[in-house]
């Protein structure tokens, strides 16, 4: 039996909303995953890419990541990972550095065996280079095999990578495909193989409303009642609260109504995102944002989705270029 944590899209170094606090949140979320791994005594932590938000992470982000990985190494839990599109560099990868420090293993076409499971890796590959991609992997003698990859795979949203093609053209039969890139968690069965995303560990955009987390994956003959050999369970992470305030104003309402809607929520230490729709009077987003931060919000952003109509019409006339030049020359007495 092999038990691993499957995570990805940690985006360490992302100063969301230009906030140093949010930047630390992304590192803290990764540290929380490692804490759980150590507490649970899993056999490995598998990271499916985009460990960093940028290919040039700041020194503080690198040092913070190394500190977290050292705790994992001290607990004798291997960190297995692939390279995502956000962090991919033209030369050597940061993951290679961590491997030289004995803090990580970069997965590839050779198997990395943990207990009775062989792990393979597929870094992010741009769409333009996939036509010539060969899904060739070295053989293994483990009981189970898993592919870890980064990209937008079918049948999930925004897909541009055919999962069935990968599985059918691969010379290794995989029991599971552990993915990264799509920040929405999901699970599906493709060609009798479980394919899953754990989602991001922190909210990297306003569209990521659901709670964050990771997957706990078990490879065992008794997994999933003995039928599938693979059991995938989702586990939640406690992260920075986001408060979504949706305000649909009627014709007689304005900024006071928006403030009242904000007042109805506990915004302490939260990222507050206010969306205004409907009719009503104009509002001043900065004033509403200040109101939210005065009530304890870490960050507040207001989006006014209403279309402002005006009865005024503006006529735009374009001057003839040659006439404009002649007039300018004459005015200069040339």
Where are each of the predicted segments found?
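Amphipathic, non-transmembrane alpha-helical secondary structure
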Residues: 27, 31-38, 63-66, 134-135, ...
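His/Asp/Glu-rich metal-coordinating catalytic cores
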Residues: 44, 53-196, 200-213
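Accessory, non-catalytic peripheral segments of nucleic-acid enzymes
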Residues: 227-334
